[in-house]
């Protein structure tokens, strides 16, 4: 399953789930061919507060094929789109991006051109690359608190 395409497609199909994913992600989390598509979706959501594929295509016509492909990828998975799934896919995308950053730094660390004095800084960057948690405030909406409370009752 192409998690990146499926997530974008899921958000286009149900924009009520966008707040559980889009604030956590950035363009760097996506592979190069999907970066413009994600940027179009995220930018439209930030400015308009909704995700309407027709309006997004009208604003970004060069992304039409990628947007439709993402929706098709999501539909072909035949899975129910829920908040939990969107959060899971978001976490997977963030973890994959962190792993790629870590691997890139690891290759740089073993490169013959890297000096010994550069290693402590590289190791620190490797540790930071694995930190996928974004800085959030202590604020939780009543809806989130209620959701968490109900989930713990089950």
Model regions and ranges:
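Short amphipathic helix-turn segment from helical bundle oligomerization domains
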Residues: 73-79, 107-114
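Residues at alpha-helix boundaries and short interhelical turns
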Residues: 15, 45, 96-100, 113-117, ...
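Long, mid-chain structured domain cores
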Residues: 84, 97-108, 117-120
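Non-catalytic interaction/clamp surfaces of large macromolecular machines
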Residues: 104, 112-137
